[in-house]
Amino acid sequence: MTEADSSATPLARGVEVIAQVVATLPLSPGVYRMLSGKGDVLYVGKAKSLKKRVVAYTRPDRMPLRIQRMIAETASMEVVTTRTEVEALLLESNLIKSLGPRYNILLKDDKTFPHILITADHDWPQVLKHRGARNRKGEYFGPFASAGAVNQTLAALQRAFLLRSCSDSVFASRTRPCLLFQIKRCSAPCVERIDRDEYLALVEEARAFLSGQSRRVQHDLTARMESAAEAMEYEAAAVFRDRIRALTRIQAHQDINPAEVEEADVVALHQAGDGVCIQVFFFRSGCNYGNRAYFPVHAQGEEAPQIMAAFLGQFYADKTPPREILLSLEPDEVAIVAQALSEKAGRKVTLSVPKRGDRKRLVEHAHDNARDALGRRMAESGAQRKLLEGVAELFGMESAPERIEVYDNSHIQGSDAVGAMIVAGPDGLMKSAYRKFNIRSTDLTPGDDFGMMREVLTRRFARAQKEDPDRDRGLWPDLALIDGGRGQLNAALGVLAELGIDDVMLVGIAKGPDRNAGRERFFLAGKEPISLESRHPVLYFLQRLRDEAHRFAIGTHRARRSKGLVQSTLDALPGIGPKRKKALLHHFGSARAVAEAGLPDLESVEGISHAMAKKIHDYFHPEG
C-alpha cells in the first residue's frame, strides 16, 4: 500500500488510505477493521459486499461526525472475507465485543448473568446458583437478571421438589438429616430418607419446570393431588398441594407474567437526544426472570434500527438466544440478524415486533421501563456533572474530571494484603474498570500501608504507560484519590515522580482527628489541608467514593482470606493432586475425617492404592 499524501488534511489522508484498499477488495462478504497509526482498532464493520460497503467511506460528507473522525484517524485497514453475510455478522459481533473499538456502538455494561445449575457429576444431583464459566457438568437454566431472582426461584424449587442444595463434601459427611429436612425444604438424600429413583424423578420434574414445561408439571401435580384425595390419602394430597403452591408462588411474585410466553427475551429501545436505553426482560418457563437496562455508548447520531442491530449482535455474542425475541422496533437487516442468532443457537430463533395481544403489552411495558430508566440516567448524569465541576473547583483543576480513581488497602496485620482501585466518571461508578491488586512484595513489614500503596500505584501507572502511552484510550485518571493523609500522599507522589508522571492530580483524603465522617481533610501537594462543611454535596460525593473503595478493598481481602482458609491440610500431602483430594473429600466428607481414618478405610477410596493409603496414614500418624 502506498503512503497517503502527508500534506493533506487528516480526513483526506484517511479517505486516500481507504480508497487504496477499496481497489483491492472483492465483492464477497466479510469483515473490515479500521486501524490507527499505532495499530489500534478504531472500527469493525461487516458487509455483504466488501467493495460496495467500504467505498462509502470515501465519501465522508455523507457520514455522521463520529465516523468522519474515525476516517481521519484511519492509517490502514485489515479485511477478512467470509463465506456468507451471516458468518460476517457473527464475526463482527465477536470482534466488537472482544476489541471494544473506539468508534463502534458498544455494550459496555454487559455483566455475566446468574443461572440455576442442576449438577450431573454426582449420584444425587444438586440444585444451586451458578455464575461465570460453565465448567461443571450439568444443565444450566436462565439467564436471571439478578441474584435475587435466582434465590427466589431456588427457594420455590426447594419447596416444590425437595432437592438438595448442600455441597458434595457436606452431603458425604451427614449422618442425620439437616434442618432443611425438618422444615420440608429437602428430602434428605444424604441419609437416604428417599429412594434414589424417586429422587431422580423429582430432579426430572424440576428440570422439566425450568425447561419451560411448567404448566405440564403443575397439571401432573394437580392430577396426583386429586387422585390422592379421592383415595383418602389426605397427607399425601397435602404434600402435593404445598408443592403446587410453591410453583405458583414463583409466578405470583412477577409484576408481569403472560400466559402465552414460555421462553422469550423482550428487548425495547428508547432514544432521546444523545441518550439511548435498551431494556431486556427475560421470560423462561412462563416466568418473568427479571430485567436489565443497558446504555450503549458511541450511539450518538445513529438511527434506532442500527443501534438495535448492534446491540443484539453483541448481547448474544456469548449467550444462547431464546427461541423468541420480541422487539420494540425492527433492527437493520433483521433477516440476517435472525439467521445469525439461529445458527448460534442451533435452532430457529424468531425476531418479531408484536402488533397485538400479550406480546405487544410485554414490549410496551419494557419500552416504558427503558424510557423511565433513560430519564433517570440523564437526570443523574446532570447532577453528577455538577458534582464533578465542584470537585474541580475544590482542587483547582482546569476542568471537571472525566475519570476519578480511588485507592485503598486492606489487610490484617499485613496478612492477605490487597490493594483496591475503584473508578468514577460522568456516568457514575464504572464497576467494569475496578481493579484489585494482591500485594506481592515480600520485604514489607506487616502493616506497611505506605509500602503497599507504593506497590499498587507503581503497578497501576506502569501498566498505563505501557498500554496507553499516548493517553487516548481513556485509561488515565484526571484525579487520583488516596485513602490516607499526608504520609500516603507523599508515598503516592514519590511513585509518580519515579515514573516521570507529573500531570495526574493526587489528593489524600483522611478522616478527622477522631476518625469521624464529616470532618475529612483533603491533602494536596504543597498546600494546606482543605476541609468542607459537613453537609456540603461535594464532600458527600467524595465520601461516597472513599467508602466505595473501602467496601471493595474489604470485600477483596475477605475473599482472598476465605480462599486461604478453605485450603485443607490435604494440600500439604505429597502426591495428592486435585483428583485424589476430591475423591478423599467425597468419601470421608472432610479433611479431619481423612486424618482420623484407618488404613483399611483409606484403601477403600477409589483411586487410592495401598502405597498411597499408607503414605497418607503415615503423614497423619507419624508415631505409627
From Swiss-Prot:
<dbReference type="InterPro" id="IPR050066">
    <property type="entry name" value="UvrABC_protein_C"/>
</dbReference>
<feature type="domain" description="GIY-YIG">
    <location>
        <begin position="27"/>
        <end position="105"/>
    </location>
</feature>
<dbReference type="GO" id="GO:0006289">
    <property type="term" value="P:nucleotide-excision repair"/>
</dbReference>
<comment type="subunit">
    <text>Interacts with UvrB in an incision complex.</text>
</comment>
<protein>
    <recommendedName>
        <fullName>UvrABC system protein C</fullName>
    </recommendedName>
</protein>
<dbReference type="Pfam" id="PF22920">
    <property type="entry name" value="UvrC_RNaseH"/>
</dbReference>
<dbReference type="InterPro" id="IPR010994">
    <property type="entry name" value="RuvA_2-like"/>
</dbReference>
<dbReference type="InterPro" id="IPR003583">
    <property type="entry name" value="Hlx-hairpin-Hlx_DNA-bd_motif"/>
</dbReference>
<comment type="similarity">
    <text>Belongs to the UvrC family.</text>
</comment>
<dbReference type="InterPro" id="IPR001943">
    <property type="entry name" value="UVR_dom"/>
</dbReference>
<dbReference type="GO" id="GO:0009432">
    <property type="term" value="P:SOS response"/>
</dbReference>
<dbReference type="GO" id="GO:0003677">
    <property type="term" value="F:DNA binding"/>
</dbReference>
<dbReference type="GO" id="GO:0009380">
    <property type="term" value="C:excinuclease repair complex"/>
</dbReference>
<dbReference type="Pfam" id="PF02151">
    <property type="entry name" value="UVR"/>
</dbReference>
<dbReference type="InterPro" id="IPR036876">
    <property type="entry name" value="UVR_dom_sf"/>
</dbReference>
<keyword id="KW-0742">SOS response</keyword>
<dbReference type="Pfam" id="PF08459">
    <property type="entry name" value="UvrC_RNaseH_dom"/>
</dbReference>
<dbReference type="GO" id="GO:0005737">
    <property type="term" value="C:cytoplasm"/>
</dbReference>
<comment type="function">
    <text>The UvrABC repair system catalyzes the recognition and processing of DNA lesions. UvrC both incises the 5' and 3' sides of the lesion. The N-terminal half is responsible for the 3' incision and the C-terminal half is responsible for the 5' incision.</text>
</comment>
<dbReference type="InterPro" id="IPR035901">
    <property type="entry name" value="GIY-YIG_endonuc_sf"/>
</dbReference>
<dbReference type="InterPro" id="IPR038476">
    <property type="entry name" value="UvrC_RNase_H_dom_sf"/>
</dbReference>
<dbReference type="Pfam" id="PF14520">
    <property type="entry name" value="HHH_5"/>
</dbReference>
<dbReference type="GO" id="GO:0009381">
    <property type="term" value="F:excinuclease ABC activity"/>
</dbReference>
<keyword id="KW-0267">Excision nuclease</keyword>
<dbReference type="Pfam" id="PF01541">
    <property type="entry name" value="GIY-YIG"/>
</dbReference>
<keyword id="KW-0228">DNA excision</keyword>
<dbReference type="InterPro" id="IPR047296">
    <property type="entry name" value="GIY-YIG_UvrC_Cho"/>
</dbReference>
<keyword id="KW-0963">Cytoplasm</keyword>
<keyword id="KW-0227">DNA damage</keyword>
<keyword id="KW-0234">DNA repair</keyword>
<dbReference type="InterPro" id="IPR004791">
    <property type="entry name" value="UvrC"/>
</dbReference>
<dbReference type="InterPro" id="IPR001162">
    <property type="entry name" value="UvrC_RNase_H_dom"/>
</dbReference>
<dbReference type="InterPro" id="IPR000305">
    <property type="entry name" value="GIY-YIG_endonuc"/>
</dbReference>
<feature type="domain" description="UVR">
    <location>
        <begin position="215"/>
        <end position="250"/>
    </location>
</feature>
